[in-house]
Regions:
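Extended, highly charged segments
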Residues: 1-70, 74, 83-92, 109-116, ...
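Phosphate/anion-contacting hairpin/loop surfaces
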Residues: 66-163
Length: 163
């Protein structure tokens, strides 16, 4: 299972590579993940710009220019691969740096401009992808999460208050 530091590194890698890229097409190869992938994903996000990628706990949140948000949770075995389209047989730009990405478990393929492709690969299918509304932070599971360890208010005094 990817742990919080891995998710943070992945978020930074995504921001470095795909920030301000346009979503050309989303191909859903298998919608049957932990929760069914909304089949409307392509129609909703096609042509939209990814403003940036943020992280809350182990959830990756793709902030889209039209104020939509795409949530990705990697589950137990999920990985995201950033691939330059003209270098598919070479090392890809993902955190995992796999040379040969097994196509069998590529459940979601997001075709981006700037010659990038984003692949969600998950052999166990425990991860999930969903669209969020703007008020998502007040809904489950976000309203039950603990403090963010990388925020400045998570310090000795915060911990002392709860001991």
């Amino acid at each position: 299972m990817p742990e919080l530091p891995e998710i943070e590194v992945l978020k930074r890698s995504l921001n470095r590579n795909i920030k301000l890229t346009k979503i050309n097409k989303i191909k859903i190869n298998n919608p049957n993940l932990r929760y069914k992938v909304p089949l409307s994903l392509n129609n909703t996000l096609k042509g939209q710009i990814i403003k940036n990628v943020s992280r809350i706990s182990k959830y990756l949140i793709f902030n889209i220019k039209n104020e939509k948000k795409l949530l990705i949770h990697l589950g137990m075995s999920g990985t995201i691969h950033i691939i330059k389209k003209n270098k598919q047989n070479n090392t890809n730009g993902s955190f995992y740096n796999s040379r040969n990405l097994p196509k069998k478990h590529n459940h979601i393929v997001i075709d981006l401009n700037k010659n990038f492709k984003l692949i969600y690969n998950d052999p166990r299918r425990f991860g999930y992808i969903k669209l969020l509304n703007n008020n998502f932070i007040n809904e489950k599971p976000f309203n039950r999460l603990g403090p963010e360890p990388f925020k400045s208010n998570f310090n000795f005094f915060y911990i002392k208050k709860y001991i």
